[in-house]
Every structure is written in structure tokens, then in C-alpha cells.
């Protein structure tokens, strides 16, 4: 009987189930979107029960459409939108409030208070993160402080907390496994990434009882099995878990120290594997856990760019410059350069390395001769410049010079952007055959745990390149262009 690995990719706007075979190829996939809730400006929430329902739906659709029987699944891997926090009742299994999403700013005031109390340095040292509404810890505190009776129940040990991976493993296992992996734990603001424990000092700071927290386990391990009721009568091992960006790093086979990937989605997330050492950042990067496997923990440096693919959507929907995102490449290629135009797409502030939430988008260098083509090209180029900002920070922090950059995500189909990215970085850019690297990473982690794949060397062999973009731009030209970008950033920051 042919066996497969089922990867569950629980994202910010949709849930997907993807079946992979022994060669790491996609056999079939199913996707279902779910509701976004915006109760107040800047707040973003999800219904955790609806997410669970969407997961069950995509599993059923994927297996039936692929004509694969449940007993053909060798293991399940889970990858998830990180930081999003769920708190539920241990007895009823029902969430006591909506899941507060990573994008949500509803805990900004809590963060300001913690910063004012001088906790910033301690948090940075222990977690590798900044005090920010982005991470799970303040979201849990907010739920306990704002939902009636929640704090008392939590103190009595009646509530459980989890990021989305934890919630799904708990549901699939029928409440038997309350676990998370190192990569997800490292995004909570409650986990010490050096001694690999929930940290009492951090928990006291956030007033979160330890009894709520899941057990932290390696990213590739059997955590439990599906209960018959949720998996068509089968007990399938749930065997791999990693946060979405870390899963993509694993799916890109970036196993060596100094290897890096950049995911071009709504935003961009660039991760560099720093091996078994946690590199503290002096340049606005986050230090995070990549994965834990075979008794070892790998660390990574991470840079976040808030606006990437969403800038292309803005050109399409907001500015109505084209009907399909793929047309952006055609327009951008019609002109030799932007003619000195720079677009800084700081629609929601700037991420790494600036961390400035007050700035807004801007455009510079416009003349009477500026056309739609120049404008589109400048917007695409901004993605490459922002990536260079992150890479410069990574090389400065790690002391490692990047040899090649592996890329994935929706915008990598844009050949113009990938070539310009290579030119601006002066580094080859490699696009893989399989772009679904996040789901693939979770599948690999699960497959290794159940012996479906032997080891990481076997996985490395499966990574195949679709196209390699080599830098051909003169160093002087790329330096000049990048200097113009830095000037545009400074001018943008001055206008508030």
C-alpha cells in the first residue's frame, strides 16, 4: 500500500491540507478560507472553532479528491501562523475568547507599560524578541484580564493556552496531547530560548499561570495520534510541528549554518540558519529557534518586512494599475530603470531593521516624465531593497557572508523581481521547483519522525532548482541605487 505524509498548513487567511509522496512531490491539496474578525481598528481575531472546522474540511476534501484512504497516511505534519493565541477551557474544550491574531495591535498598551517598567533588556536576552503586540504573551495576558472570570479559572488550572499548532494537536488527539514545538514556543515572549524552558520571570511579568502552558517538545517527534472520531477511524501519528517561517527554512533544506531563505508573501520573512548558537542581534533582527531535531536545537536570525506582496495588491486594487498581479512584471520590464523614482511602501510602518510603526508610505523622484511603468517598477524594486536592508543586518550580526539566497512565496514567480533581487544583493537567487516550502517543511519533520524519510541528507537530495538568477549589474550601479533607497527611507522617516 502506497503511503503519504499529510501536511496541515494553517495560515492567516486559509487552512490547507497537502499530500506529499516519498519524493517530496505534491500529490494533491485542498484549501478553505475562514472569517477575519476586526472588532475595533487595529484588532484582528479568528474563531478558533472555525479554524478547527476548516482543518477537518480540508483533510476530508484532500483525501477524497486524491482517492487516498486514511490508512495510507504515514504521519501528519502541522505548520501554522505563528504567535496567534488561543485560550480554551480544559473541560469543555471551548475557547473562552476569539484567537488573537499575530497582526492584532490590541495589546499595544500592555507593551508600552512593560517597556516603561524597563523589561525590554531582560525580554531581549531571554527570548531573542522585542516587547511587541506581535508576540503571544501579551495576547494571553489581555484575554485573562478582559474575559470575565478568566483569571480565576486560569489560577485554578482550568484553562489552557496554545498557539495554533497546540490547539490543532489538542483537537486531533482528542485532548490527550497539550504540546508545542521549540520553534512556536520561541515566539511567545514566555520561553527562554537558551535553557529551553518556560521562564518564571517572564510569566510573572505577564501574570500568566504556568499551568496553562503546553509541554515544549522537539519539532520532529510523535506527539500523539489522531482519535478515530477525527480521522475516519484511524489512529495516525501527529509527528511534526513548526511555525510557518521555520517550516519554510526546513522545506528549503537550509540545514547548514549561514544558509538563508526569503519568503515573499503578504510581507517578507527572511531567516538565516545560525547553527547551534543563538546570535544576539545588534541590528534590529529577532533571534529565534529554527527547529529542534535529533536532540539538537538550531537557531535562526529573522527579519520581517511588513509589506511585500501586498504592495503589488495595492497597485492592482488600490491604484488600479493592472488587473492581474502577473502583469506587474510586464509593465516593469518595459522601462530600463525607474528614472530615479523610489516607492517606500511603509503602509503599516517599517519592520526590520527600522522598527518604526509611525511612518507611512512615500514616493520620491517623480517628474513630468514619470509613467505608470516607472511607478510599478519602483514598487517592485522596493521589495528587493527591503530584503537588502535585512541581509545587511544579518551579515553584520552573524559575521557570515551569504553565498546564495533561496526564495519562495507568491511573488517569486516574478522573474523581473528575482533578477533585480540578485543584482541588488550581488548574490545568486535560487527558486525551487516546489514553491510550497512551508507545507513541505512540516511534511519532512513528520516524515523523519516516523521513518518515512531516513535523514536530512535524503531530504537535501530532493531539493531541486527551478531557476537560478545570477547578478550581472555593475557594483557601482547597484551601490548607487541602494544609496538612493537609503535616502528615501530617511526622508520617509522625517515625514510623520
From Swiss-Prot:
A Gene Ontology BP annotation from the UniProt entry: glycerol-3-phosphate metabolic process
Residues annotated for sn-glycerol 3-phosphate binding in this entry: 12, 82-83, 134, 244
Transmembrane segments: none
Activity regulation text: Activated by phosphorylation and inhibited by fructose 1,6-bisphosphate (FBP).
Binding site for ADP: 12, 16, 266, 309, 410, 414
Pathway: Polyol metabolism; glycerol degradation via glycerol kinase pathway; sn-glycerol 3-phosphate from glycerol: step 1/1
EC code: 2.7.1.30
One GO cellular component term noted in the UniProt record for this chain: cytosol
EC category name: transferase
One Gene Ontology term of the molecular function aspect: ATP binding
Keywords, sorted A to Z: ATP-binding, Glycerol metabolism, Kinase, Nucleotide-binding, Phosphoprotein, Transferase
Residues that hold ATP according to the record: 12-14, 266, 309, 313, 410
Binding site for glycerol: 82-83, 134, 244-245
InterPro entries xref list: ATPase_NBD (IPR043129), Carb_kinase_FGGY (IPR000577), Carb_kinase_FGGY_CS (IPR018483), FGGY_C (IPR018485), FGGY_N (IPR018484), Glycerol_kin (IPR005999)
Residues where Phosphohistidine is found: 230
Catalysis performed (reactions): glycerol + ATP = sn-glycerol 3-phosphate + ADP + H(+)
The protein's assembly and partners: Homotetramer and homodimer (in equilibrium).
PANTHER family attached to this UniProt entry: GLYCEROL KINASE, SUGAR KINASE
Family from the record: Belongs to the FGGY kinase family.
Function of the protein: Key enzyme in the regulation of glycerol uptake and metabolism. Catalyzes the phosphorylation of glycerol to yield sn-glycerol 3-phosphate.
Protein name: Glycerol kinase
Source organism per UniProt: Bacillus thuringiensis (strain Al Hakam)
Lineage of the species this protein comes from: Bacteria, Bacillati, Bacillota, Bacilli, Bacillales
Amino acid at each position: 500500500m502506497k503511503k503519504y505524509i499529510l501536511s496541515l498548513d494553517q495560515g492567516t487567511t486559509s487552512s490547507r491540507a497537502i499530500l506529499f509522496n516519498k519524493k517530496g512531490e505534491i500529490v494533491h491539496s485542498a484549501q478553505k478560507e475562514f472569517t477575519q474578525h476586526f472588532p475595533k481598528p487595529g484588532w484582528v481575531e479568528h474563531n478558533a472553532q472555525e479554524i478547527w472546522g476548516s482543518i477537518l474540511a480540508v483533510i476530508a476534501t484532500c483525501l477524497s479528491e486524491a482517492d487516498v484512504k486514511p490508512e495510507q497516511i504515514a504521519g501528519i505534519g502541522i505548520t501554522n501562523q505563528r504567535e496567534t493565541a488561543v485560550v480554551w477551557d480544559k473541560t469543555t474544550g471551548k475557547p473562552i475568547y476569539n484567537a488573537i491574531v499575530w497582526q492584532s495591535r490590541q495589546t499595544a498598551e500592555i507593551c508600552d507599560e512593560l517597556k516603561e517598567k524597563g523589561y525590554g533588556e531582560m525580554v531581549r536576552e531571554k527570548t531573542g524578541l522585542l516587547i511587541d503586540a506581535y508576540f503571544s504573551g501579551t495576547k494571553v495576558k489581555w484575554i485573562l484580564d478582559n474575559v470575565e472570570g478568566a483569571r480565576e479559572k486560569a489560577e485554578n488550572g482550568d484553562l489552557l493556552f496554545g498557539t495554533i499548532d497546540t490547539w490543532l494537536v489538542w483537537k486531533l488527539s482528542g485532548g490527550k496531547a497539550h504540546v508545542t514545538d521549540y520553534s512556536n514556543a520561541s515566539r511567545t515572549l514566555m520561553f527562554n530560548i537558551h535553557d529551553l524552558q518556560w521562564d518564571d520571570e517572564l510569566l510573572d511579568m505577564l501574570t500568566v499561570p504556568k499551568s496553562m502552558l503546553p509541554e515544549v517538545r522537539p519539532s520532529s517527534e510523535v506527539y500523539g495520534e489522531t482519535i478515530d472520531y477525527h480521522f475516519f477511524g484511524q489512529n495516525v501519528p501527529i509527528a511534526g510541528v513548526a511555525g510557518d517561517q521555520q517550516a519554510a527554512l526546513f522545506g528549503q533544506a537550509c540545514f547548514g549554518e549561514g544558509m538563508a531563505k526569503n519568503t515573499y508573501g503578504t510581507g517578507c520573512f527572511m531567516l538565516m540558519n545560525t547553527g547551534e548558537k543563538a546570535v544576539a542581534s545588534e541590528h534590529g533582527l529577532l533571534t529565534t529557534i529554527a527547529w529542534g531535531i535529533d536532540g539538537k536545537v538550531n537557531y535562526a536570525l529573522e527579519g520581517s518586512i511588513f509589506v511585500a506582496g501586498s504592495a503589488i495588491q495595492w497597485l492592482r486594487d488600490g491604484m488600479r494599475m493592472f488587473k492581474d498581479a502577473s502583469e506587474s512584471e510586464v509593465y516593469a520590464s518595459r522601462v530600463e530603470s525607474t528614472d530615479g523614482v523610489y516607492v517606500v511602501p511603509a503602509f503599516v510602518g517599517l519592520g526590520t531593521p527600522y522598527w518604526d510603526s509611525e511612518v507611512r508610505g512615500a514616493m520620491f523622484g517623480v517628474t513630468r516624465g514619470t509613467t505608470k511603468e516607472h511607478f510599478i517598477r519602483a514598487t517592485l524594486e522596493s521589495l528587493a531593497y527591503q530584503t537588502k536592508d535585512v541581509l545587511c543586518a544579518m551579515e553584520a550580526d552573524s559575521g557570515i557572508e551569504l553565498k546564495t539566497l533561496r526564495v519562495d512565496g507568491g511573488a517569486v514567480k516574478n522573474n523581473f523581481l528575482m533578477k533585480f533581487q540578485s543584482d541588488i544583493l550581488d548574490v545568486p537567487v535560487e527558486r525551487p521547483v516546489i514553491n510550497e516550502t512551508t507545507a513541505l517543511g512540516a511534511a519532512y519533520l513528520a516524515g523523519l519522525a516516523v521513518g518515512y524519510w531516513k535523514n536530512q541528507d535524503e531530504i537535501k537530495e530532493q531539493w531541486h532548482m527551478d531557476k537560478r538568477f545570477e547578478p550581472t549589474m555593475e557594483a557601482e550601479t547597484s551601490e548607487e541605487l541602494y544609496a538612493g533607497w537609503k535616502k528615501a527611507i530617511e526622508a520617509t522617516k522625517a515625514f510623520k
